[in-house]
Curated annotation (Swiss-Prot):
Family indicated by similarity: Belongs to the glycosyltransferase 28 family. MurG subfamily.
Protein name: UDP-N-acetylglucosamine--N-acetylmuramyl-(pentapeptide) pyrophosphoryl-undecaprenol N-acetylglucosamine transferase
Enzyme Commission code: 2.4.1.227
Catalyzed reactions: di-trans,octa-cis-undecaprenyl diphospho-N-acetyl-alpha-D-muramoyl-L-alanyl-D-glutamyl-meso-2,6-diaminopimeloyl-D-alanyl-D-alanine + UDP-N-acetyl-alpha-D-glucosamine = di-trans,octa-cis-undecaprenyl diphospho-[N-acetyl-alpha-D-glucosaminyl-(1->4)]-N-acetyl-alpha-D-muramoyl-L-alanyl-D-glutamyl-meso-2,6-diaminopimeloyl-D-alanyl-D-alanine + UDP + H(+)
InterPro entries hit by this protein: GlcNAc_MurG, Glyco_trans_28_C, GlycoTrans_28_N
Its membrane topology: Peripheral membrane protein
Localization per Swiss-Prot or TrEMBL: Cell inner membrane
GO molecular function, one term: UDP-N-acetyl-D-glucosamine:N-acetylmuramoyl-L-alanyl-D-glutamyl-meso-2,6-diaminopimelyl-D-alanyl-D-alanine-diphosphoundecaprenol 4-beta-N-acetylglucosaminlytransferase activity
Gene3D superfamilies cross-referenced by the UniProt entry: Glycogen Phosphorylase B
Source organism per UniProt: Sulfurovum sp. (strain NBC37-1)
């Protein structure tokens, strides 16, 4: 008897699987992903999984004409392979986090009558999750009132680093491991004003931009901690008093778990504008700020330094539940036992 975990492509999806699997120690776990995207990089050598499989699949929605047909054919072939694996490992439940790499296994679960539990990480539903939602045994979303579990699966370390913010002594710019040009530009524009106020700068500029951004800071005589990918993100968040960040779901909830007040600048080309709606979920509760990339105003950004951080920080501590990963893991265990 096993629990099958599937989905990914991007770090946001994969972070959910990572958080949940850590609460499933002792269970037989199988991961099925794609050769495209980051799946293999994250889980190929992960010893928590009994076996890992990576099929040749790719997105369908972003393809046209013959490319779409080819993607569908690849998915059909992968689905047949996934069905065999569900039978081989006597799968009792399939946990899907969405993304194109989950499609084959999610459809295999439906065709083989294996319970399908779906986690939707964004406020705007992904195309695949929207399609499969009526067939899911459970559909989990932190943004939906009817969700059986509202808590987002966040790694414990982010809760361990929680603290109430009052004054801005350190600011962190988070553009993700790939970086965000708009956030990099904003950081460098306001850096002199931050220096005048004695505010320390931590800046995730993106792997490809590290050298350029470091030089830009040096050219204007400002010390800043600049990095790309890091395994110490929770520690950096702990040190910061204010964040300026993209609004990917994992980043948003990790910042919230750390009770770090944030100005979100959503990635403007995200599918269904989901980053905007992710951020809006907190903005409507007066727990964050939002600014469209094309409407960035440095004076308004600097004005946030004098805002009431404590109220937002305490508010974040109240709305974020700590045991989302465990709640999902317990649900999967119940299906595995039935």
């Amino acid at each position: 008897m096993s629990i099958i975990m599937t989905g990914g492509g991007t770090g946001g999806h994969l972070a959910i699987i990572k958080a949940v699997k850590e609460q499933l120690k002792g269970e037989e776990l199988i991961y099925i992903g794609s050769t495209t995207g980051q799946d293999r990089q994250w889980f190929e050598n992960d010893e928590d999984f009994t076996e890992t499989y990576f099929f040749d699949t790719r997105g369908v929605v972003n393809q046209r004409g013959f490319g779409k047909l080819k993607s569908l054919w690849m998915m059909l072939q992968a689905m047949m392979k996934a069905r065999k694996l569900l039978k081989k490992y006597d799968a009792k439940v399939v946990f899907s986090v969405g993304g194109f790499s989950s499609a084959a296994t999610a459809f295999a679960a439906k065709s083989a009558s294996v319970p399908l539990v779906i986690h939707e990480q964004n406020a705007a539903l992904g195309s695949l999750n929207k399609l499969l939602r009526p067939y899911a045994a459970a559909f989990i979303s932190s943004y939906l009132e009817e969700s059986p579990i509202k808590a987002y699966p966040i790694k414990e370390v982010f809760f361990d680093n929680v603290r109430v913010r009052k004054n801005v002594e350190t600011i962190i710019f988070l553009g993700g491991s790939q970086g965000a040009k708009a956030i990099n530009k904003l950081a460098l524009e306001i850096a002199p004003k931050l220096k005048e106020r004695g505010i320390r700068i931590i800046h995730q500029a993106g792997e490809k931009n590290i050298d350029e951004v470091r030089k830009d800071y040096e050219d204007i005589g400002i010390e800043a901690e600049v990095f790309g990918f890091t395994t110490k993100l929770a520690d950096y968040m702990k040190e910061a008093d204010l964040a300026i960040a993209r609004a990917g779901a994992s980043t948003l909830w990790e910042l919230s778990a750390t009770a770090l007040p944030t100005l979100f600048i959503p990635y403007p080309y995200a599918v269904s504008d989901h980053q905007y709606y992710n951020a809006q979920f907190l903005v409507e509760k007066d727990l964050a700020w939002i600014m469209r990339e094309g409407e960035i105003d440095t004076q308004k950004v600097l004005a946030l330094l004098g805002e009431d951080l404590e109220t937002k920080s305490r508010g974040l501590m109240e709305i974020v539940e700590k045991d989302g990963s465990k709640q999902i893991a317990d649900l999967l265990k119940n299906y595995a036992k039935s």
